[in-house]
Amino acid sequence: MKIGQVSRKYGLSKDNIYYYINYGLLVPPKLNSQYVFDDETIRDLEEILALKSMDYSLSEIHRIISLHRISSIESPGDKRELMDMYSDKRAECAVKVKHYEAVIKDLDERIMELATNEPAVQRHTGLPLSMLNLLCCPECGRPLEISDVNMDMEYIYDGRLTCSCGYHAVVDDGIVITPNGYNGEVDKPDLTRELYKDLPPSLISLFQRSYNYMKEELEEMDLSGKVVMETYINAWFFLHNHQQCFSPKGFYIVVDKYPETLHMYKDLIERENYELPILYLADSSTEYPLKEGCVDLNLDFFAVNEHNFYHDTFLLSCLRPYFRPDGRILGTYFYFENGRESMKELLGTYPQCSASNFSLTYFRKETAAAGFSLDKNRVCGYTTDSGNNLGFSFHHKGEKMYLMSYDGHLESGR
């Protein structure tokens, strides 16, 4: 047979076959400068493939093939050597089998734990009655009236929120949905978490370093009775991944422009059952039906960046009216160092994106202009490759994207 026929019959690439020849495993005769695979060479190839299936290395296979070629295993010494090689491989496999049996047992336990970890009855939540006092009309500031209510002693599940000035919103499955829906075409609700897929391990490690900083700062805070807000969760949602860091005696406001994203996360949070009182708010603006001066802490993981995808304004300036006089900010800002090509790609994909997005100078300047002072910050590192994923498709390989975590407060008198 010719090499092409051998390749097709045994499902091997020609490069593989040539490698075996160059390695000395196969020694086919030549006819007119072309290799011819006679019966003996084919037997050698089949033996090589059989030994490979037994996890022998090429050097071990070469030794076994050589023993057959030199002595045909007639010598007692060669027989003993071959038996020893088989016995050693058998012992090696027995160790692996024992190891894999233990691995299978551990995996079975993990699968069983996940299968049985579902709560017998999933807790269903709504708009907490304890947080109704945070709501007001965003147009005139008056209290909202509620009607057509489906509720119990703890939550409102459905209803209508109205004001005499004409403002109205609805409560749908516990989510407050305002008239400010998103009608753009450059984004969509990420219900299957495409943003998380195909992130390279190096970037995930960078995320974790920033998470660690934010968790360290949270450990120093007493959030009992405090109101914590996080916006733009369709991109990244810090609170969801770190619910164990938050007090069930606090109050939490979660905002996104997509009701679908809020419904998805609400269902997950109900399954996880950390019993955090959460007001879910669907609104694509920053004119929320919230009282001024009600927020103690704002969480930001990419939210400031995400806001600038669609607005030329600075998110913390827009949220400023909702902060208490002693309000705090905790987050992670993403910025480029000389990211000219990445920003060109970003601005081409998102026509409404601010040209100041991903700029550390812009972030520091606008944070101060909004009346906030950064108490601490930590540059957690940078990546030059965000991988092939939806979340950072605009990031050009080679350009440095940094993550800076920060903690700050609203300056008195501002």
Spans of model-derived segments:
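Class I SAM-dependent methyltransferase Rossmann-like catalytic core
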Residues: 175-224
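Class I SAM-dependent methyltransferase SAM/SAH-binding core
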Residues: 224-287
